[in-house]
């Protein structure tokens, strides 16, 4: 008995020592990890490229925010070593080489040669930076770039909007050129509407529909349900002073058709699309099927509004049906943003406004505001214990059901956020209409804004405006959100930095954490203007989780090489416009909510949207219970649903075939935390120590048992 108690005491002492040992190992690992990070950042800072310099710091009044913990302040460190010293303008984002890394599509116009060049820079995992990949040049001045799969082969192609550089008139005459990625990863021009016009070559089956250019930046979406991206444009002329048309994609080019001659639109009176415009393909009524939204000049109200065309099935056939009335935007509206800003599962609007002046090419000079305009429709049913009334709410098992909707009409001060009171104004002008960048910086489930500002002296600022609850209306359970200055990036006061023309959220290392890319211009020592960019990397983590989702465009991915001459190695370059995602998540208080996101919803005026949807899940220890994806098709079955998705993962949806959603598949890859390997090493060390101790104690116990057994046998005499 004494030996047993002695052994037990020794076991307890060893366990205490084991805990102390584990704590010391963990502490040392954390210290080494932090010190290495600080050294790396210091070295990178010392080796920075000094041509384009930006500083960053937290905004002071953040200290009084009750909702932000001291431990949760964002920390951004500038990184000059990720290959962003590129003398070209940013055009779009996409996965060019199908390695699940987002690449850069850039361009530059040479005034002397009258040529534009498209550059592809891919992110190299080996070198941990963006590296040059390929380029292509053509005659014309680029006005917009869209990276998208044009011929349905899974490889990322490039669609360019350009002006004739020999046209001295100030008319908005935009032509289109299509560049396909060939088997050698190079871009080849396969269609050019300007060349078709010069050669007097017909691009339509009906001579009335022969259209070579558009007067607005077009909307890109699949109109005729073949999975190929089409183009909706507008031209001056006709009895109304304008007419709409569509360039239908034929895989190796486009054919033009007048809007009125296409039988999928329930035709009614049209208004003129504005220039600039922020038209979109986005789910307005919550049925997981994207609708068409155009920013138009309402001829009756003499104001800019949203013209909405709902994607509906009528008597077994698909139509776009015009909504009964336009939604009139606030006066002096700029580029409209679409997203689930209050986290209730419906697409809301965020509209920046300002007073402009013709003296600075219609830039903002006063009264800069941000309007939050909620989309009021059926929410998710709040209880799973009783049968829900589906006329008042959506059950989690049927989130993709159509609902009546209404955008908030009475926009009081509760719905308005003031941008700045110290003389800063929203960036952009008539030549470069500026979009705010949208993303959830802290994965709390609410979309924040990245805004470029300027003062009267020309100095540029980039700020993160945090999305916070402003007021809750009890009568209709409506959360009103506001946007507040949260984090600031300031350009160098030196005169060499002449402009910051754009900024965007970007997940550089594909870890579910949004970093910042800032794009600008500077003057070299020999007085030449060059483009450049800098990256700010998030170097701290919150305890919030995320879900990243990407939908392909409907190409076959698995086992389709049997039907082709060769194996297709590129499948992730679709950059599909309009797929809709809906998820449900339960927070730490047990409250279930739904979220919605739309992939690549806009295409005009360089919106710089990422080729995926990043959901912030907040603090939750649960799975994503339901995950829906809907494709912008005209099929009866256009969406599918999966359950129990692991957080902190990237889901790739393979909607093949497009006409049968029951056969759609998903691929899931889990993104480990930054501390995953440290935790793994510490766990292995602890398990090894525990294993050794168990072995020692087991051997000792067997020795003690052997001695006791011998002592017990000595009391017996064998005769």
UniProtKB/Swiss-Prot annotation:
- From the record, give the transmembrane residue ranges: 678-697
What are the boundaries of the signal sequence? 1-32
The keyword Signal appears for this protein = yes
What does the similarity note say?
Belongs to the TIP family.
Q: What UniProt keywords apply to this chain's record, in alphabetical order?
A: Glycoprotein, Membrane, Signal, Transmembrane, Transmembrane helix
InterPro entries, A to Z: FG-GAP, Integrin_alpha_N, Tip
The stretches that face the Cytoplasmic side, renumbered to this chain, are 698-719
Question: Where is the protein found, in the record's own terms?
Answer: Membrane
Kindly provide the name given to this protein in its UniProt entry. Answer: T-cell immunomodulatory protein homolog
User: Which GO CC terms are listed, alphabetically?
Assistant: plasma membrane
Where are the annotated glycans? 144, 277, 410, 540, 659
Membrane-side (Extracellular) residue stretches: 33-677
Per the record, the domain of life is: Eukaryota
Where is it mainly found? membrane
* Membrane-topology annotation of the record: Single-pass type I membrane protein
Function as written in the Swiss-Prot or TrEMBL entry: May protect the parasite against attack by the host immune system by immunomodulation.
């Amino acid at each position: 008995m004494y030996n047993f108690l002695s052994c037990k005491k020794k076991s307890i002492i060893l366990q205490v020592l084991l805990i102390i040992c584990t704590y010391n190992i963990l502490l040392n690992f954390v210290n080494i990890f932090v010190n290495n990070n600080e050294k790396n950042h210091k070295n990178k800072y010392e080796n920075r490229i000094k041509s384009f310099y930006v500083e960053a710091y937290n905004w002071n009044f953040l200290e009084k925010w009750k909702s932000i913990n001291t431990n949760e302040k964002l920390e951004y460190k500038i990184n000059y070593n990720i290959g962003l010293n590129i003398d070209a303008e940013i055009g779009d984002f996409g996965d060019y080489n199908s390695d699940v890394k987002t690449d850069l599509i850039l361009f530059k116009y040479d005034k002397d040669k009258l040529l534009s060049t498209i550059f592809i820079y891919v992110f190299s995992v080996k070198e941990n930076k963006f590296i040059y990949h390929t380029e292509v040049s053509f005659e014309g001045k680029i006005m917009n770039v869209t990276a998208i799969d044009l011929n349905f082969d899974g490889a990322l192609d490039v669609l360019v909007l350009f002006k004739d550089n020999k046209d001295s008139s100030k008319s908005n005459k935009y032509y289109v050129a299509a560049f396909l990625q060939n088997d050698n990863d190079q871009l080849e021009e396969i269609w050019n509407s300007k060349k078709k016009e010069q050669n007097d070559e017909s691009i339509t089956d009906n001579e009335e529909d022969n259209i070579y250019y558009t007067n607005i930046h077009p909307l890109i979406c699949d109109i005729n349900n073949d999975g190929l991206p089409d183009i909706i444009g507008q031209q001056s002329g006709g009895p109304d002073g304008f007419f709409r048309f569509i360039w239908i994609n034929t895989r190796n080019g486009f054919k033009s058709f007048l809007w009125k001659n296409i039988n999928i639109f329930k035709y009614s009176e049209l208004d003129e699309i504005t220039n600039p415009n922020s038209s979109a393909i986005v789910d307005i009524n919550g049925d997981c099927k994207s609708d068409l939204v155009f920013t138009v000049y309402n001829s009756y109200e003499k104001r800019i509004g949203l013209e909405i065309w709902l994607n509906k099935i009528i008597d077994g056939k698909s139509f776009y049906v015009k909504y009964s009335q336009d939604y009139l935007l606030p006066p002096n509206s700029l580029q409209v943003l679409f997203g689930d800003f209050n986290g209730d599962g419906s697409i809301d609007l965020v509209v920046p406004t300002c007073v402009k002046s013709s003296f600075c090419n219609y830039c903002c000079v006063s009264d800069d505001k941000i309007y939050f305009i909620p989309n009021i429709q059926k929410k998710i049913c709040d209880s799973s214990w009783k049968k829900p009334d589906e006329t008042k709410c959506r059950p989690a098992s049927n989130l993709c059901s159509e609902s009546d909707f209404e955008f908030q009409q009475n926009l009081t001060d509760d719905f308005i956020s003031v941008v700045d009171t110290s003389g800063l104004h929203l960036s952009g002008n008539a030549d470069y209409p500026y979009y705010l960048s949208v993303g959830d910086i802290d994965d709390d489930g609410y979309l924040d804004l990245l805004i470029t500002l300027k003062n009267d002296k020309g100095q540029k600022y980039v700020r993160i405006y945090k999305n916070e609850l402003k007021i809750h209306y009890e009568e209709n359970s409506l959360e009103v959100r506001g946007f507040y200055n949260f984090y600031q990036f300031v350009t160098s006061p030196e005169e060499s930095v002449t402009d910051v023309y754009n900024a965007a959220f970007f997940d550089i290392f594909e870890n579910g954490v949004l970093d910042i890319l800032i794009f600008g211009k500077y003057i070299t020592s020999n007085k030449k203007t060059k483009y450049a960019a800098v990256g700010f990397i998030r170097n701290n983590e919150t305890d919030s989780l995320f879900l990243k989702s990407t939908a392909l465009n409907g190409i076959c991915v698995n086992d389709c090489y049997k039907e082709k001459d060769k194996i297709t190695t590129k499948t992730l370059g679709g950059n599909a416009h309009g797929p809709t995602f809906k998820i449900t998540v339960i927070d730490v208080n047990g409250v279930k909510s739904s979220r919605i996101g739309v992939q690549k919803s806009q295409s005009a005026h360089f919106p710089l949207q990422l080729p995926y949807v990043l959901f912030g899940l907040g603090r939750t220890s649960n799975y994503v219970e339901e995950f829906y994806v809907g494709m912008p098709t005209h099929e009866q079955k256009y969406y599918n649903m999966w359950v129990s998705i692991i957080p902190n993962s990237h889901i790739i949806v393979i909607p093949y075939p497009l006409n049968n959603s029951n056969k759609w598949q998903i691929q899931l890859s889990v993104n480990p935390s930054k501390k995953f390997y440290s935790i793994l090493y510490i766990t292995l060390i602890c398990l090894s120590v525990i294993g050794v101790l168990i072995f020692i104690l087991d051997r000792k116990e067997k020795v003690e048992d052997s001695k006791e057994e011998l002592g017990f046998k000595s009391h017996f005499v064998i005769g």
